[in-house]
Amino acid sequence: MSKLIILRGNSGSGKTTVAKALQERFGANTMLLSHDMIRREILKVKDGRGTPACTLLIHMLKYGRKNCEVVILEGILDSECYQELFECAIEEFGSNIYSYYYDLPFEETLRRHGTKPNCHEFGESAMRRWWKEKDFIGSIPEMVLTKEIGLEETVDLIYKTVVY
């Protein structure tokens, strides 16, 4: 049975870095669905209610369940705008969902953003506009990740939870 890992949180939390490390750790037959890549690079659409990114992510999620051992879905993924995606995840993966939410202070996400190669693309004012405090899904239990948990520790924690 295919397993789904969901990584969510505000911009600059570390979702993409953890997702890529997990894909490497799990190896072959691990599908990575990056919300930003699909929305900004593949579709070139804005985020929000009714975004075509949600529809494409649903199709890709279904493909992943049928064809991959592990599917990693990562992104801000606003709990209201992507409700249909989360409902699909529950239908497709049932109890094989491992969901994590980065609950970090704004200052920490800003600090982390400053370490990224693309930090020049947007700054503090944009991050403040996008900020959503404690944007939990509700219908899917999410384990909270805090600033005290480092990259390797996070990857190890998720990997061991999914494998065992």
What is the meaning of each model-derived region?
Residues L7:
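Hydrophobic anchor at the beta1->P-loop junction of P-loop NTPases
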Residues N10:
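P-loop (Walker A) phosphate-binding loop of NTP-binding proteins
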Residues S13:
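ATP-binding Walker
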Residues T16:
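Walker A/P-loop
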Residues K20-K66:
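Conserved substrate/cofactor phosphate-moiety recognition/catalytic segment
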Residues P52-G94:
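Glycine-rich phosphate-binding loop used to anchor ATP phosphates in small-molecule kinases
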Residues F93-R112:
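Conserved phosphate-donor/acceptor-positioning beta-strand/loop module used by diverse small-molecule
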Residues T115-L157:
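Small-molecule kinase domains that catalyze NTP-dependent phosphoryl transfer to phosphate-bearing small molecules
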